[in-house]
Design a protein with these regions (language model features):
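Noncatalytic, basic helical substrate-engagement surface that gates or grips nucleic-acid strands
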Residues: 1-60, 64-84, 161-167, 171, ...
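Non-catalytic nucleic-acid-binding/docking modules located in mid-to-C-terminal regions
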Residues: 8, 27-30, 73, 84-171, ...
Length: 178
């Protein structure tokens, strides 16, 4: 279900992939392509391995899902806005720390990743709840204690929707060409 709404690459984009591959090869840059792995999952996996080795990482992307990777060792560069995105920027956009972005997206939903979210809960309310309860798991455990009747009932009856995460998967395969 996750990313089920993902469309195939547009007809005018797909032919460009081979040009990108050839350009990367011409510059003698290593490249990574693994069947059945999302690019953001590979990016997260490599970012983790690189930071564990003691280096800092800059990820070049405008994909907001990658904001959950931001830390004192990982930053994003959004080429569309020509802007470096650090922890403060993530907090400004989502109202929570980067490590909590996934919980906010799970509650508020994200149609581009087929994450339904909880009806009636947007990013602002999701951020308030996550800031108060610290994690989605803790919020759902304590949902019966929420004082607002409608919010409490909505959360209790939509726990399954809240648990559909847009979590980036960090996995072991890290083979590359180049």
């Amino acid at each position: 279900e996750y990313k089920a709404n993902r469309e195939e690459a547009p007809d005018d984009l797909a032919p460009q992939f081979e040009y990108i591959r050839k350009s990367v090869e011409a510059f003698n840059l290593p490249s990574i392509e693994l069947l059945n792995y999302e690019a953001d999952d590979l990016i997260a996996t490599y970012a983790k391995k690189i930071t564990e080795a003691g280096a800092k990482v800059t990820v070049i992307s405008s994909d907001k899902d990658l904001m959950q990777l931001v830390s004192n060792k990982v930053r994003l560069f959004d080429p569309m806005k020509s802007k470096v995105i650090g922890e403060k920027d993530v907090i400004e956009k989502f109202g929570v720390k980067p490590s909590q972005v996934i919980d906010v997206q799970s509650l508020a939903g994200d149609s581009s990743d087929n994450v339904p979210g909880v009806p009636g809960i947007g990013v602002k309310t999701a951020a308030e709840l996550i800031n108060k309860y610290k994690t989605l798991e803790n919020l759902l455990k304590k949902a019966s204690e929420i004082p607002q009747n409608k919010r409490r009932e909505t959360l209790l009856s939509n726990k399954d929707k809240a648990m559909i995460l847009s979590l980036i998967h960090i996995s072991e395969p890290t083979r590359h060409r180049g």
